């Protein structure tokens, strides 16, 4: 099982449901601790696991952002494994699946195959198509042939993220554009 956090409601409070979170790009489960606490204090069992290539799944610098040999399909399977585990541990509670940013893309893919396993879905910060998406996919496939599937191209990063990073440049925080007040 991937590195994960489960936060239960305090004391004798009876759980009213499960909220499973799927985090975004360049994030990890510990960034959500305050969110888990907020909802667990309201009576929810809150759960989040690090996506491959993120958080405690990263053992070497080459692991950052690497989704494994199965890529997207493997991430969908990881979500299903964790959801199945949560439903087995807490069988009589409704499960709400929340995906943020890249996690929103993953949960949208997940419900195409497994909608019967969840009771509600929340999609937030979902990225939209941009004019470079298809070109980016082609460039990434070509680059994989020459430099392997773990190579992180600064060019591709600038092409895909540059427009979002520009307004936050003065903050001096890498990936500040991912989430702001």
Feature map (PLM): residue ranges:
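Glycine-rich nucleophile elbow surrounding the catalytic serine of serine-hydrolase chemistry
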Residues: 99-109
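Alpha/beta-hydrolase active-site loop
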Residues: 67-87
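Alpha/beta-hydrolase-fold enzymes
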Residues: 109-181
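Conserved alpha/beta-hydrolase
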Residues: 29-31, 36-62
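Active-site glycine-rich loops that stabilize anionic/oxyanionic intermediates
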Residues: 16, 21-27
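Alpha/beta-hydrolase fold nucleophile elbow
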Residues: 90-101
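A short loop-to-beta-strand scaffold at the N-terminal edge of the catalytic core in hydrolase folds
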Residues: 1-10
């Amino acid at each position: 099982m991937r590195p994960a956090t489960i936060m239960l409601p305090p004391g004798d409070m009876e759980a009213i449901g499960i909220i499973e979170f799927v985090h975004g790009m360049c994030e990890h489960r510990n960034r959500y601790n305050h969110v888990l606490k907020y909802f667990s204090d309201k009576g929810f069992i809150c759960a989040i696991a690090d996506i491959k290539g993120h958080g405690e799944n990263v053992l070497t610098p080459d692991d950052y952002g690497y989704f494994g040999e199965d890529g997207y399909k493997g991430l969908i399977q990881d979500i299903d494994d964790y959801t199945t585990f949560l439903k087995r541990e807490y069988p009589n509670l409704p499960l709400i699946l929340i995906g943020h940013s890249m996690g929103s893309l993953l949960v949208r893919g997940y419900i195409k195959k497994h909608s019967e396993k969840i009771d509600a879905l929340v999609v937030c910060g979902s990225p939209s198509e941009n004019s470079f998406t298809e070109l980016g996919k082609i460039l990434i496939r070509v680059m994989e042939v020459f430099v392997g599937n773990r190579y992180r191209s600064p060019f591709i990063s600038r092409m895909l993220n540059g427009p979002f990073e520009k307004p936050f440049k003065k903050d001096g925080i890498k990936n500040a554009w991912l989430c702001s007040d």
